[in-house]
Amino acid sequence: MTTRLYLSPTPPRNDREGASKSTSASIKHDAYLPPADGNRVLVDRFGRIARDLRVSLTDRCNLRCTYCMPAEGLEWLPTEQTLNDAEVLRLLHIAVVKLGIRQIRFTGGEPLLRKNLEDIIAGTAALRTDEGEKVHIALTTNGLGLDKRIAGLKEAGLDRVNISLDTIDAERYVSLTRRDRLSGVLASIDAAVAAGLHPVKINAVVMPGVNEVDIVPLAEYCISKGAQLRFIEQMPLGPREQWKRGDMVTAEEILARLEEKFTLSPAKEPRGAAPAALWNAVDKSNPVITGQIGIIASVTHPFCGDCDRSRLTTDGTIRNCLFSRTETPLRDALRDGASDDELAQLWAGAMWEKKPGHGIDDEGFLQPDRPMSAIGG
C-alpha cells in the first residue's frame, strides 16, 4: 500500500553519510565553525546545522499524564537553579545573533506556568537575525489557561502554538492526565484558531490499549476545527514500565486506522527538517470534509539524519538530542562571568558531539536521566 511506502525513512539531506566524511575532515572542533561570511552556526560532525531551538522554561506541570510522570508528581527544581528571565534572554540573543538559530519554541513542563512568559516572548520577538529578520516563535502547551492569555501572547510576538491533546473523550482524558480539565483545553483550541495562529497544531501521543480508539475521533474533531492533528509514536521518555518497543502503536497502525475513515494522500509540500510526514485527508463518507494530518514516527522511522534542533533546559544546560544522556551546562559559566563568545563556544562544542541517531533500537539503549517534563518537547 502506498501509505506504507511513504513511511520508509527519507534519505538524509545532502547525502549525510557522504557529507559527514568530507565535512569531518575540514571542520575543526576548536572554533565555532563559522562559514566564509563569518556568521557562526551550530553544526555537528555529520554536517547537520541546528536552526531550531527548544527552550524549556519550567519543569513544572499542572497535569500528571500517566506516560510522563507519577501521580504524586516529581520534585521540581528550586527556583535558584533555574534560569531567570534575563539569563534566558541573554542565551537566546547568543543563539540568534551568534549561532544562527532561526526558530525558537518554548516548552516546559508547562510553559504557561512560567511567570512573565509574555515578557520573555516579547524580548525574543525583539531579536533580529543577521539578515534583519524576526525569529519564528512557537509554544508547546497542554492548553490549560491558554484561552485567557492568547491575545497577550500573540501581541507579544507569538507566531504559532502546539496544543497537546491525546483524547477528546472526557473520561479517558481524566484517566490519562489525572485531572478533569478537558473543557479548558477545547476552549483553548477554539481561542488559538480564532486568534489566527495558523496552523494550530494538536499533538496526540498514541498508546497501546489506552487511546487507539481516539485516532479517528481526534482526526474528525481537529479537521472540523481547522487544526492540524499530529499523531506521535510513544517514545521511551516517561516511567520505564510505560514503554515496550514491541507493544507500541506504530505509525503504520495509526495510518491503517485513519484509512478506515479517510482517503489519504501524501502532502506535496517539502518536509525539510520537520518531524511529521503530512497527509491530505478526505472523509470517505463526505468528500467535502478535508484536512491535513501529520504522523511523527520517531521510533519506527526516525528523522535523525535531518534533525536541526538544539535544546536548552530550564536549569541552563544544552542537550544536543532529546535522548542524550550527556549535557553541557551553561548556567554556571554565565553566572561566573563568561562572555557571549565563551558561552557560544560551549554551545557549539555541545552540538558538535551530537550522535548520528537517537539509538532507541540499539541493544545498549538507555533512557535519558531527565524525564520528558524536564527536557521539553
Swiss-Prot record:
<keyword id="KW-0004">4Fe-4S</keyword>
<dbReference type="GO" id="GO:0061799">
    <property type="term" value="F:cyclic pyranopterin monophosphate synthase activity"/>
</dbReference>
<dbReference type="InterPro" id="IPR000385">
    <property type="entry name" value="MoaA_NifB_PqqE_Fe-S-bd_CS"/>
</dbReference>
<feature type="binding site">
    <location>
        <position position="201"/>
    </location>
    <ligand>
        <name>GTP</name>
    </ligand>
</feature>
<comment type="similarity">
    <text>Belongs to the radical SAM superfamily. MoaA family.</text>
</comment>
<feature type="binding site">
    <location>
        <position position="140"/>
    </location>
    <ligand>
        <name>GTP</name>
    </ligand>
</feature>
<keyword id="KW-0479">Metal-binding</keyword>
<dbReference type="InterPro" id="IPR050105">
    <property type="entry name" value="MoCo_biosynth_MoaA/MoaC"/>
</dbReference>
<feature type="binding site">
    <location>
        <position position="68"/>
    </location>
    <ligand>
        <name>[4Fe-4S] cluster 1</name>
    </ligand>
</feature>
<dbReference type="InterPro" id="IPR006638">
    <property type="entry name" value="Elp3/MiaA/NifB-like_rSAM"/>
</dbReference>
<feature type="binding site">
    <location>
        <begin position="309"/>
        <end position="311"/>
    </location>
    <ligand>
        <name>GTP</name>
    </ligand>
</feature>
<feature type="binding site">
    <location>
        <position position="65"/>
    </location>
    <ligand>
        <name>[4Fe-4S] cluster 1</name>
    </ligand>
</feature>
<keyword id="KW-0501">Molybdenum cofactor biosynthesis</keyword>
<dbReference type="InterPro" id="IPR010505">
    <property type="entry name" value="MoaA_twitch"/>
</dbReference>
<dbReference type="Pfam" id="PF06463">
    <property type="entry name" value="Mob_synth_C"/>
</dbReference>
<comment type="pathway">
    <text>Cofactor biosynthesis; molybdopterin biosynthesis.</text>
</comment>
<feature type="binding site">
    <location>
        <position position="61"/>
    </location>
    <ligand>
        <name>[4Fe-4S] cluster 1</name>
    </ligand>
</feature>
<protein>
    <recommendedName>
        <fullName>GTP 3',8-cyclase</fullName>
        <ecNumber>4.1.99.22</ecNumber>
    </recommendedName>
</protein>
<dbReference type="GO" id="GO:0051539">
    <property type="term" value="F:4 iron, 4 sulfur cluster binding"/>
</dbReference>
<keyword id="KW-0411">Iron-sulfur</keyword>
<dbReference type="GO" id="GO:0061798">
    <property type="term" value="F:GTP 3',8'-cyclase activity"/>
</dbReference>
<dbReference type="InterPro" id="IPR013785">
    <property type="entry name" value="Aldolase_TIM"/>
</dbReference>
<dbReference type="Pfam" id="PF04055">
    <property type="entry name" value="Radical_SAM"/>
</dbReference>
<feature type="binding site">
    <location>
        <position position="54"/>
    </location>
    <ligand>
        <name>GTP</name>
    </ligand>
</feature>
<feature type="domain" description="Radical SAM core">
    <location>
        <begin position="45"/>
        <end position="271"/>
    </location>
</feature>
<dbReference type="GO" id="GO:0005525">
    <property type="term" value="F:GTP binding"/>
</dbReference>
<dbReference type="GO" id="GO:0006777">
    <property type="term" value="P:Mo-molybdopterin cofactor biosynthetic process"/>
</dbReference>
<feature type="binding site">
    <location>
        <position position="307"/>
    </location>
    <ligand>
        <name>[4Fe-4S] cluster 2</name>
    </ligand>
</feature>
<feature type="binding site">
    <location>
        <position position="164"/>
    </location>
    <ligand>
        <name>S-adenosyl-L-methionine</name>
    </ligand>
</feature>
<keyword id="KW-0949">S-adenosyl-L-methionine</keyword>
<feature type="binding site">
    <location>
        <position position="304"/>
    </location>
    <ligand>
        <name>[4Fe-4S] cluster 2</name>
    </ligand>
</feature>
<feature type="binding site">
    <location>
        <position position="109"/>
    </location>
    <ligand>
        <name>S-adenosyl-L-methionine</name>
    </ligand>
</feature>
<keyword id="KW-0547">Nucleotide-binding</keyword>
<feature type="binding site">
    <location>
        <position position="235"/>
    </location>
    <ligand>
        <name>S-adenosyl-L-methionine</name>
    </ligand>
</feature>
<dbReference type="GO" id="GO:1904047">
    <property type="term" value="F:S-adenosyl-L-methionine binding"/>
</dbReference>
<dbReference type="GO" id="GO:0046872">
    <property type="term" value="F:metal ion binding"/>
</dbReference>
<keyword id="KW-0456">Lyase</keyword>
<feature type="binding site">
    <location>
        <position position="67"/>
    </location>
    <ligand>
        <name>S-adenosyl-L-methionine</name>
    </ligand>
</feature>
<dbReference type="InterPro" id="IPR013483">
    <property type="entry name" value="MoaA"/>
</dbReference>
<comment type="function">
    <text>Catalyzes the cyclization of GTP to (8S)-3',8-cyclo-7,8-dihydroguanosine 5'-triphosphate.</text>
</comment>
<feature type="region of interest" description="Disordered">
    <location>
        <begin position="1"/>
        <end position="29"/>
    </location>
</feature>
<feature type="binding site">
    <location>
        <position position="105"/>
    </location>
    <ligand>
        <name>GTP</name>
    </ligand>
</feature>
